[in-house]
Amino acid sequence: MRALLTFFVAGLLVLSSPAMALFGNNQNSSFASGSNDFVPVDQAFPFNYFQQDHRITLDWQVKEGYYLYQQRLSFSAENVVLGDIQMENGQPYRDEFFGDVNIYTNPLFVNIPMQDWQPGAKLIVQYQGCAKAGFCYPPETRVIDITSFTNGDMAPATMPTQTANPLDTSTPQPLTQQDQLASGLADNWWTPLLFLALGVGLAFTPCVLPMYPILTSIVLGSGKLSQRRALGLSLVYVQGMALTYTLLGLVVASAGLQFQAAMQHPYVLIGLSILFVTLALSMFGVYTLQLPSSVQTWLNNLSNKQQGGSSAGVFAMGAISGLVCSPCTTAPLSGALLYVAQSGDLLTGGVALYALAMGMGIPLILVAVFGNKLLPKAGGWMDRVKTLFGFVLLAAPIFLLERILPEMWSTALWSALGIAAFGWLYHVKNSLEFGGWKQSAVGIIAVLGLFASAQPALNYWFTDSSQQTQTSEVSFIKIRNVEELQQQLALAKQAKKPVMLDFYADWCVACKEFEKYTFHDPAVAAQLKQFVLLQADVTRNQAQDIELLQAQQVLGLPTIDFWDAQGNPVSNARLTGFMQAAPFLEHIQRISN
């Protein structure tokens, strides 16, 4: 069904959703036994450093089959000032749960210049990695004492090894795991072309297209101009608009980390979803979205002071117009800014938004040079295009909420959107300007789309109700520390029930795979009813989390421990790494029996 919706949402969603990537999907890997085949973190990522006067070099020798997250690298200091950090960019990697991130599978060297040393100077380094087989280590912190030095040149040091083009950052700004698009596209030369194409598409939205003839007359002013003069003025106007967009991109990119951190919070995802739904309602004619009258008056007065036909006045008008977003451009522009924020790259942010503005300005240039004859005639088709963009905007919140909603609900939302969109298409087919085979083709597409959209919901409704109940009844008792674990083990012993303890963290890919593919399998869910199910969420890696991990001798996640009905740990039953539903079911059956 999503394939049928792709042409509705491709342009917007390429920008506004961090699109499922990097870390690697390990759902096909499994461990038939509970043995721990993973090495300690210091063997997986041997860490060394050496200081040479006012420079320090950090060195990770990444073991084969393991990788470090770029977005989990962070550097801070006490009693010393860090200069420009130079490090190579990681390799793009895709994961269905966390989106696009970068990883390091080869030795990594980071050079950090320093200045203004004071007694007690320290460098705090944080990092985290995983095994490709589906096993993640908790975040690691190393505190390095900085010896005294004399201030020197703060220019970035030369990399000891050259395996890729270095990525310069004024402050340590690793990319987040969110990610939708930033890591995957930032290094590709065609990124500006993508934004240019998006800008052209935005120019032909119903909120923007009718304004071009009016805008052209304002830009060119009174009097007849040569094509060369008209071309020059329209280019100047577009450059003014592009300047505003470019500055906006630079500002957002410079605050990339703040945007990245905020975008991971469920409240932010819900807020953005409400915003997109609100914008969609305006496209359906529920209300009229426009700037407050006071702002409109101020912008109009400011624009009227500029003289059409003069380069300076036209440039100023273009810069002012870049501050105004119509209902048709607000959501795509928000998506573009989201992409820029995720990249955290000033060059990427500036070039991408400049290309977007240039794309939006191409129709204006054509109209200024060749006249209105190049524009399609206004008519009822524009209202239908406006409604179509309403469905596009409704698709955006579903992509955002998929990250926090159960799969059942996200599937239901996709089905509902598809049924509504293709139902509307079938409803309006008879009012199209053309008839004959073209109208019939639209009707066939609408009917096929309706069936395809309804299929996921029908599959759920006709699934055996007992299986649905089994899936929904899998729930865990949350524990936070060693004391709570001991209390729950004592209660389970009194009830003469075996215990399963699942160590979980939001940054653990395989933990989410366990939750989606294994625990919610109907047969597994039924068997787990015989257990007391405990779960320790160690996402925040606080002191009590570390104490619990050490008490259970947990190297990394996922890790699942078992106790029998007498309260004794089951030897050789520990699971580390992802396991598919079928072998996991056999494993817990052996324990429960």
Swiss-Prot record:
EC number: 1.8.1.8
Residue intervals passing through the bilayer: 193-215, 235-257, 269-291, 318-340, 347-369, 384-401, 408-425, 440-462
UniProt xrefs under Pfam families: DsbD_N (PF11412), DsbD_TM (PF02683), Thioredoxin_7 (PF13899)
InterPro entries (alphabetical): Cyt_c_assmbl_TM_dom, DsbD_gamma, DsbDN, DsbDN_sf, Thiol_diS_interchange_DbsD, Thioredoxin-like_sf, Thioredoxin_CS, Thioredoxin_domain
Signal peptide range in chain numbering: 1-21
GO cellular component: a single term: plasma membrane
Membrane topology note: Multi-pass membrane protein
Disulfide bonds: C130-C136, C207-C328, C508-C511
Main location: membrane
Protein name as catalogued: Thiol:disulfide interchange protein DsbD
Originating organism: Vibrio vulnificus (strain CMCP6)
Classification of source organism: Bacteria, Pseudomonadati, Pseudomonadota, Gammaproteobacteria, Vibrionales
